[in-house]
Amino acid sequence: YCNENGYYSIYQSDRYGFNNPDEEWNKKEIEYLLVGDSFAHGACVNRPNDIASVLRNLSGKSVLNLGYGGNGPLIEYATLREYLNKNVKKILWIYFTNDPQNLQNEEKKDILINYLNNLTFSQNLKLKQKEINNLALKKIKIEMNEVIKKNSFKYELLKFAKLNQIRKKLLLRAPLPIPKP
């Protein structure tokens, strides 16, 4: 995803794919709920250095993080509508300077506009996690195959550029070292 600190961040997501310890969903009351883009998500840092973990550790309170990289205000609102059915005391919206641009792009998506126009609209995403996981795995496989094809093409192109097969046929090799007397 990103390597801003000299490493790729890795975390075990919760049951819905968010950057939380899964047991946070089992708590009867949530003190802080975070929503936002990659800053809320904890992109580029490992636990316990992401904002939700820091807040959890400093406050000693429950923190649920619904942030995700690339989200803008309308997706964040939809996320709250889909996943917020808990007793939450405080919602912290992590807003960043690129959010107005994200909002302009999101306003073109009919599915997201439904959340604004219809207060009862829901895709019931919490109940469709198996389907969501399958779609994500399918997308990952497609992208991995594209990377393999791309790298395979680069390798073949490099072999051609070095004229490996012609060199083999003509027995053109680097000269052997001269043995010492």
Q: Which residue ranges define each predicted feature?
A:
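Conserved beta-strand elements of the Class I
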Residues: 31-35, 64, 91
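Membrane/wall-proximal cationic-aromatic binding patches
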Residues: 1-58, 78, 154, 159-181
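Catalytic metal-binding/acid-base residues of hydrolase active sites
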Residues: 39, 69, 97
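Secondary-structure boundary/capping positions in well-ordered alpha/beta enzyme cores
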Residues: 61-62, 87
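A conserved hydrophobic secondary-structure block that centers on an alpha-helix together
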Residues: 56, 62-73
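A generic "cationic amphipathic patch" detector
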Residues: 45, 49-51, 68, 76, ...
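Interaction-surface signature
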Residues: 74-181
